[in-house]
Amino acid sequence: STNGGIKKELILPENLDKYALKVKRGQTQSEDMRNLGAYIKDVISLNKDNYIICGPDEALSNRLNHVFEATTRKWNTKIIKQDELLGRNGRVIDSILSEHACEGMLEGYLLTGRHGFIHSYEAFVRIIDSMVSQHAKWIKMAKEIPWRKELSSLNILLTSHCWQQDHNGFTHQDPGFINHLLPKKSDTIRIYLPFDTNTLISTFDHISRTKNYINLVVASKHM
């Protein structure tokens, strides 16, 4: 199973224009991550049993609200009426406050040949620095072994607070994860800094199609 044994090809939306934000200069206000959520919602709908979203209780904070129109948070124990957006078959792994656990679950899922991404805050993702380094090494070695199948890339989506200094600025601003990845080989690591909704959606669509990479995307979630 850990060599793409349950591999299912990822189906992606065909028409990106459907998600494009029509901008009027000086008039349009919108949130990039919220708009990306509409695209990811459709990815979930097209891949109901081979796609997961991992993150430490941040899906709504990161403005992925539209995703919950197509799925729920994964929850295997008792559900009470006060619980929000929980379900047995949810595709969002969002109910555990551990970047380590979320990244580890995603890595294992990718190894089976399936697909997904992890999202977090730019400052908090530093917790998984060493895990991502080890995965980069694994990708390098796997490329040198003929019988190793290509697998979906490890896609990391981070939100930056650099545009809102007054809100958690001291603790939430740390571009160190980019610094951590930059020295690594370019045939394994890719870093993207989309500057608006349309470039973010196009970037996410692109990285979702890649194999055997670690793709880092840093985006704004504020209006």
Where are these regions (language model features)?
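Thiamine diphosphate
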Residues: 1-223
